[in-house]
Every structure is written in structure tokens, then in C-alpha cells.
Amino acid sequence: MRFLHTMIRVGDLDKSIKFYTEVLGLKLHRQTDYPDGKFTLAFLGYGGDTEPFLELTYNWDTDKYDLGNAYGHMAFGVEDIYAACEKINELEGKVVRPPGPMKHGTTVIAFVEDPDSYRVELIERKGKSAGY
């Protein structure tokens, strides 16, 4: 067994793809329209087809979702957290907790929201691989 992907529903697929590729460096691996079901799936990731993906689901007749109160956040390692937060503001994301040390620690983190208001934690990984 292994983890394959996580899926989030988005209201504007192009805006979401731009956010995750230009800010967080994911690559669009494949995008498929399903006209009979009136939805599009886009799979983004850092590696090849054997690595986990972020699946963006765009339902053609829905542009806004109620995220509820159960969703926590996704976390991404970034080389320069300050530059990432600047880019997020440019791409209509929202920095909700500016970069700084985490409580009771020294790791520099920030919390942002993507164009659909999904919460994303950024963890600065200077001098290291941005991943774990």
C-alpha cells in the first residue's frame, strides 16, 4: 500500500493551477475533461507518476465550495518563505500568518490560503531539500 493523491475541489481551475505551479513549484502532469460528468481533473506533483499527486477537481457548474470545519491544511517545504509569500499575494492568494518562527521553536513557517481559501502551511527549508 502507498499514498497516491489527495483531492481538493476548486472553483477556477486555471487560477488554482497557476497558484500551485508558480508559487509552490508543482508541475501539471495531466489534465482530463469528462464532458459526460461535467468535470475536469488536473494532477499536479513534484516527481513522476509514482509520486503522490495533488488532484484538483473542477466541477463545471460550481464555482464556490463550503470548506466546512474539518479541513486542516496541506504543508509544503519552500526554499525562501518570504519570496513565496510575496508571490502568493500577487496570485490572489492570502497570507494569513506571516513568516516567522513557529511557537516554541525556530522553524520558520507561514500559513497562506490558496485562491479557494484552502489553508496551506509553508515551512522554510533553506540549504536543504525543500521536501522531507
Model feature map: region roles:
Residues F3-H5, N69-M74:
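Eukaryotic phosphotyrosine signaling hubs
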Residues M7-E51:
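Core segments of cupin and vicinal oxygen chelate
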Residues K38, A70, T106:
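Exposed loop/turn and edge beta-strand positions of beta-sandwich/beta-sheet ligand-binding modules
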Residues G47-E51, T62-D63, I81-Y82:
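Short, charged/polar surface micro-motifs in flexible loops or helix N-caps
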